[in-house]
From Swiss-Prot:
InterPro entries, A to Z: NADH_DH_suC, NADH_DH_suCD, NADH_Q_OxRdtase_suD, NADH_quin_OxRdtase_su_C/D-like, NADH_UbQ_OxRdtase_30kDa_su, NADH_UbQ_OxRdtase_49kDa_CS, NDH1_su_D/H, NiFe-Hase_large
Entry's localization field: Cell inner membrane
The reaction(s) this protein catalyses: a quinone + NADH + 5 H(+)(in) = a quinol + NAD(+) + 4 H(+)(out)
SUPFAM superfamilies given in the database record: HydB/Nqo4-like (SSF56762), Nqo5-like (SSF143243)
Region described as NADH dehydrogenase I subunit C: spans on this chain: 1-191
A GO CC term attached to the entry: NADH dehydrogenase complex
A Pfam family hit: Complex1_49kDa
Protein name as annotated: NADH-quinone oxidoreductase subunit C/D
Protein species of origin: Aeromonas salmonicida (strain A449)
Function: NDH-1 shuttles electrons from NADH, via FMN and iron-sulfur (Fe-S) centers, to quinones in the respiratory chain. The immediate electron acceptor for the enzyme in this species is believed to be ubiquinone. Couples the redox reaction to proton translocation (for every two electrons transferred, four hydrogen ions are translocated across the cytoplasmic membrane), and thus conserves the redox energy in a proton gradient.
The gene coding this protein: nuoC
NADH dehydrogenase I subunit D as annotated region, ranges: 215-601
Amino acid sequence: MKLTRDFPSNYTMAQWQPSDHQDAQVVGELFSHFGAERFTVQSTRTGVPVIWLARELLLDVVGFLRKLPSPFVMLYDLSATDERLRSHRDGLPQSDFTVFYHFISIDRNADVMLKVPLAESDLHLPTLTGHFPNANWYEREVWDLLGITFDGHPHLTRIMMPKSWQGHPLRKDYPARATEFDPFMLDAAKQDMEQENLLFKPEEWGMARGNENEDYMFLNLGPNHPSAHGAFRLVLQLDGEEIRNCVPDIGYHHRGAEKMGERQSWHSYIPYTDRVEYLGGVMNNLPYVLAVEKLAGIKVPNRVDVIRVMMAELFRIQSHLLFLGTYIQDVGAMTPVFFTFTDRQKIYTIIEAITGARMHPAWFRIGGVAHDLPKGWQRLVQDNLLSWLPKRLMDYEKAAMRNSILRGRTIGVSAYTTEQALAWGTTGAGLRATGLNFDVRKWRPYSGYDQFDFEVPVGSNGDAYDRATVRIEEIRQSLSIIEQCMKNMPEGPFKADHPLTTPPPKDRTLQDIETLITHFLQVSWGPVMPAAESFQMIEATKGINSYYLTSDGSTMSYRTRIRTPSFAHLQQIPSVIKGSMVSDLIVYLGSIDFVMSDVDR
């Protein structure tokens, strides 16, 4: 285990002002190699160069980005937008549907987003699975939800919706409310069809059968299995205890979170973000409200930044404690999970006193937080957390992490390299366990994290043991950050003085009718955000979580793209676990620390 404070100094915090990033190094490299006339550079509030190019150029450009001296080694996100109803598209290429690709270069600490316009009559693109293996699930999701075909894809099938589903839900002409559908009817013929679809056929999953003398055993692990940690199914192809092949099956927890973003106001969507990763609490609010604040041009007061950081770190500790208890339980020890739940209850006491709720406070607001900190909050933080948890962590390390059985079950198990992690889009503790110091709070500071003194724990072996030890040390660093928040909490307002702060400060509404009207409109109809695009990533509990928002100058988002870490982490499972035992798979699943709501959205 190593602790490091080193992080690149070349990163400038993205401001809300629009920019086309024409001066970005990667833009110059693309212009020089391919010619500037082949690209359109879009001005956005994402903080990332956004470059439009023709479909025919896509594979060449992606290959070029991978071979640069400081290459773009991670396909961070891939999704699409139905542009057919969008009004504000001045200066952009004609497009009915737009597919966007978000790449990250670790060496540069820089991103680039490529956009490819498509006509409704020809929704085809070449697959990127030959360049990035994690493009597989992202392309399946785009086909499933928007109906765009990726030629050459090895297994282009539904991933979120059931096999028998009709239509593509993220299209603008697809209903967003249950009342817009015909009444649901299940006759005998349809029931028979659904039962037929549930039959397991190995060939449909890309699994080989045996020969006339022997065959493999096929085992369903889930979708209701305690070690699956949620509604998650793994189909295993076994040769005895050895896993020859493995196919994850997701979508059982899909709730249409991105579609909901198109019919909720910017303000009323905040509670939905709480439930994307239901252990993260206000941590889930943070990337969303930061992205909206970029759209609005809101700079929050220093007190708001520090309050948000403190609350986010409280939920990080909560999540890591649940991971620790259940992980040790998966390996075979029962006692620690009861201790970690006792610790979590103490933290919930703090959270409830501050926000009024426990797991899903929905407490952050556009331009601030719901209300100021209550009297006596420092005593709660000190007594329930800072004076209690450090000693408990030492007990966990002695009782569990140094236990010979746990070490024997986890050291060297389900290990992968930094290069493999980047290829699959792995972030968070799963990436840092391989030895790479990449923490967004340090590399790309947001909400004032650059003002805090903390270290980034990294591992060295990238195995199940390192993933646990990294998270334990992250709890210690979070405790340090919370203590700094408590001792250095700035004075000042808990909301920004800005017309789009939602809801506006209540006391102002009692002084003049104009402010009262503004308050009424923003709470009922919602604030109107400028037509623009914004993006914000944060270091969430499970890895990097981000929101990419498109505003068309309305009270609601035109497109809400939620990139979650757990989706990428589950896609990596087959590449890591093939050739291992089933017992090792249980350890691996526990070490990932995923939540199915985070996967399925």
